[in-house]
Amino acid sequence: MRNYLVIPLLIGYCASVEALTLEQSVAQAMINNPKLLQKYARFEARYKDKRAAFSDYLPQVSLYAATGYERIVHNNGRDFDSELNRRELGLRVTQSLFSGFQTVEEVARLDYEIKADRQALVSAAENLSLEIAQVYIELFKSKGVLELSEKNISDHEEILEDIKSRAQKGLSSDADVAQVQSRLATAHSSLLAAKNNHFDLRAQYYDLVGVYPNDLHIPRADTNYLPESLAIAIERAKANHPEIKASIFDVKAAEKQIDREESDFWPKVDLQLDINSNDNIGGFEGPDDDGRIMLTMSYDLYSGGKTVAKTEAAAWRKEEAKAIRDDTYRQVVEGTTLAWNAYRFVTEQKDFYRQNVDYASQAQIGYMKQFVIGRRSLLDVLDSKIELFVARKNYLNASFEEQKASYRLINATGKLIEELRVDTPEAWQLKEQDTEESTKQEVNK
């Protein structure tokens, strides 16, 4: 007779009015999780930075006004005019015609920064989804441990009543009663530890999702997203992982930063329109109006080596970005390998724990029968109870660890949100339209 007593114990867990699936938990967290909102705020701010850079393509219009007392003295020391209230009013319109490609490169750099920040946002959402999935599954496991612990107490209480009855008949000693009571106290302690863990998990869930868990449903990972081998898993991770994509865009942004700094080696050409309407200027009473349109050029011949130093600094930042990209590749490969190993071995391990439950259950039943006829000691019976309790806990743990390993492996390949069928917020989708078409092409360059 098999006595797994694991998954069936969880059937009564769903008893609240509203159901909250894993997918719904992730979707809700994407809207209100503070850590994710931080990433989103940075993503939005980058768009504003790009808009600010783009403004250099447009005319710059400024209005100037001034008024005050003017006194002019000739070289001979005589006052030219006694009192005049000088008034100035001017309008200047400047259109940049050539900035050494500074605006072009800055806009291009920020476009890559936007793409990098979006991938960082997706990566944060992927990792948050994994955290929620793990806590979600741990809640089920903790509920199972609670029920196992309660049954363990019930079993020991039955044994205690039986031993007390036997002691009254002279078939067992007071030491036997004390021994069972000691084991019962340990069982109560284990139950309290299980309750503590369960409520800690509820707090963790609240931290991630923003609400306390109510009615949960056992999740099942879509096996279509589970790779068949480690090689396939690594290949998917390299192609899809948002951290890798973000690091690639960071390198491209660093390249554009170099080009932007080099723009200071070029002259700047502007078209400038000035219109002035003044009064009492230069000691002459009355209006003094003028207007002009000029083509201006400025060329920085020497800046103390600043331009060269800034260009070299940008080149080193590119090297830093490349090193981060290479390290990201290694971390993704390592994470995928660890996730694959966990998934593979916990699946095999679960089969042995199942056998452990079978044999421990058979041994416990046999020991109890032998104890009744005096062929086994009370200690043997109690030890067999503990062994069965531990075997059931191990099988319970392995069953849920297998589920956690499945989600971890899918996350390692960068496809967890897709597997959960969770749509990212609409604001992400709108920004995505601006940059996603070229994302794959840029990553593959």
What are these regions (language model features)?
Residues 86-88, 134, 179, 290-292:
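Transmembrane beta-barrel architecture of outer-membrane proteins
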Residues 37, 60-84, 94-123, 245, ...:
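Small/polar (Gly/Ser/Thr/Ala-rich) solvent-exposed segments
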Residues 38-53, 124, 128-148, 165, ...:
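Amphipathic alpha-helical coiled-coil segments
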Residues 1-4:
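Positively charged n-region of N-terminal signal peptides that target proteins for export
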Residues 20, 125-238, 250, 339-342, ...:
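Periplasmic alpha-helical coiled-coil/stalk elements that build and connect Gram-negative outer-membrane
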Residues 12-16:
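N-terminal signal peptide c-region/cleavage motif recognized by signal peptidases
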Residues 394-445:
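Acidic, low-complexity, intrinsically disordered peripheral segments
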Residues 90-92, 136, 270, 294-296, ...:
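Membrane-embedded beta-strand positions in outer-membrane beta-barrel channels/transporters
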